[in-house]
Amino acid sequence: EPLNNGVDYLWASNKLQDVTSTQVSMPILFQHCATQIVFNISAGSGIKLDKLVSASITPANPGATMDMITGEITPSTTYSTETANMGINGFTAQYIMLPLKTNTAMPLTLQILADGENTPRTYNVNVLLPNGELAGGDSYVFSAVIDGNSVSFPNVEVLGWTEVDETGKPLYPSQKPD
């Protein structure tokens, strides 16, 4: 079955299993196979951010497959024809997507209320992928700085995606009601 964006695919393996004893104990450690992308948005000079209204990206083309022996999802080399809404928590936006390998920048659209205005400002930017990829099992945390009419990305952290609660859900960010 082809895989889709927006799904946290988990995979586990245990090569040290002993099923011959009467008390079978098999520790299972799940790992994330998709990729997580996070944008931490902050104000630069000359602007006061009031609210992140919406964030959307163009994720990897869906339809990838997972190797059930290794848990690896084959990365797409192209973007989807559809955008995806990101989860928002304060000034943090997050999305789970299939792995992607391309040197083409990823489209990102942010709608932000700033400086006490009632109409959101729209920022359309292209985000370069670190080393041309978003690898499965990793979390990419971008710092996004809004400076009036532009967005810059001064830093991106590539982390092993292990930050989960007891149910396996990502710890950050979660959707908050308005």
Regions found by a protein language model. Name each.
Residues 141-178:
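Intrinsically disordered, low-complexity repeat and linker tracts
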